[in-house]
């Protein structure tokens, strides 16, 4: 099995190294950002050149985003030998619920799926110090199942693993979690104001049975969530069909 690994914590991150070890015996390639890129979402570098450095055999660093890394991995490094699966992680912390909208880990996997390769994002929902081995082994086992039973279209799976041994798993829906929506104002030594956003330590997870949040944080099971690349909201799409925009014709003839 040929595997492309990436992440958003950087090419030297412990979670990435654990993931590579979990795929021991497979043909493993790594293309990852050269530095920390957490919460970079699906940003891609279109207005500056990128540099690619081979830091070890089949192990590359890109001075860009997680999306850049997977794009380079699939369209340059492995252009003539496509991988069977892309795996992103192991992230240093959870990517539950609406975290997936901000996560560079998830975005790296999503780029793989967009480019036609089955992909998995895996995160360890635990505070430091981290032991990534169990999460990495679970992701490797899941990847083998994806390759053995390939879906008709590229699949994107978001995996969150609780700390400790994985006693089981659930296929779960995305939950909802919110953070402290505060802006902290400070002043630098030159008297100029600067700001921190997002808040710290004020995460609220809605109690939704069967959600990834409940599965991982309350039941201590691994959560596997299939994510959909089509962002159209179908119920609202049907509702909009009954709307009119004053002064404009709907669906005019050519």
Swiss-Prot record:
Sorted UniProt keywords: Cytoplasm, Hydrolase, Metal-binding, Nucleotide-binding
Family annotation (Gene3D superfamilies): Survival protein SurE-like phosphatase/nucleotidase
Cofactor binding, note field: Binds 1 divalent metal cation per subunit.
Enzyme Commission numbers on file: 3.1.3.5
A UniProt-annotated Pfam family: SurE
GO cellular component: cytoplasm
Positions annotated to bind a divalent metal cation: 8-9, 38, 91
Reactions accelerated catalytically: a ribonucleoside 5'-phosphate + H2O = a ribonucleoside + phosphate
Annotated GO MF terms: 3'-nucleotidase activity; 5'-nucleotidase activity; exopolyphosphatase activity; metal ion binding; nucleotide binding
Cofactor(s) demanded: a divalent metal cation
Subcellular location per the Swiss-Prot or TrEMBL entry: Cytoplasm
Xref: SUPFAM superfamilies: SurE-like (SSF64167)
This protein's record includes keyword Iron: no
Family to which the UniProt record says this protein belongs: Belongs to the SurE nucleotidase family.
PANTHER family: 5'-NUCLEOTIDASE SURE (PTHR30457), 5'_3'-NUCLEOTIDASE SURE (PTHR30457:SF12)
HAMAP family linked to this entry: SurE (MF_00060)
Function in brief: Nucleotidase that shows phosphatase activity on nucleoside 5'-monophosphates.
Name listed for the protein in its UniProt record: 5'-nucleotidase SurE
Organism for this UniProt entry: Anaeromyxobacter dehalogenans (strain 2CP-1 / ATCC BAA-258)
């Amino acid at each position: 099995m040929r595997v492309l690994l990436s992440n958003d914590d950087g090419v030297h991150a412990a979670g990435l190294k654990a993931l590579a070890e979990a795929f021991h015996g497979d043909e493993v390639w790594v293309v990852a950002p050269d530095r920390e890129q957490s919460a970079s979402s699906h940003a891609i570098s279109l207005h500056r050149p990128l540099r690619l450095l081979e830091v070890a055999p089949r192990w590359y660093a890109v001075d860009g985003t997680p999306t850049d890394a997977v794009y380079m991995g699939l369209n340059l490094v492995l252009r003539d030998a496509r991988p069977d699966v892309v795996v992103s992680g192991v992230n240093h912390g959870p990517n539950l619920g609406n975290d997936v909208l901000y996560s560079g880990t998830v975005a790296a996997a999503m780029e793989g799926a967009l480019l036609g390769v089955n992909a998995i994002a895996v995160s360890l929902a635990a505070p430091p110090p981290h032991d990534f081995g169990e999460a990495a082994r679970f992701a490797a086992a899941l990847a083998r199942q994806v390759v053995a039973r390939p879906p008709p279209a590229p699949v994107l799976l978001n995996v969150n693993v609780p700390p400790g041994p994985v006693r089981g798993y659930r296929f779960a829906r995305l939950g909802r979690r919110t953070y402290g929506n505060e802006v902290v104002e400070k002043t630098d030594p030159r008297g100029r104001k600067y700001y921190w956003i997002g808040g710290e330590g004020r995460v609220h997870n809605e109690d939704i049975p069967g959600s990834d949040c409940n599965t991982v944080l309350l039941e201590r099971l691994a959560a596997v969530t299939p994510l959909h690349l089509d962002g159209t909201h179908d119920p609202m799409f049907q509702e909009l069909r009954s709307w009119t925009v004053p002064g404009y014709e709907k669906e005019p003839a050519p």
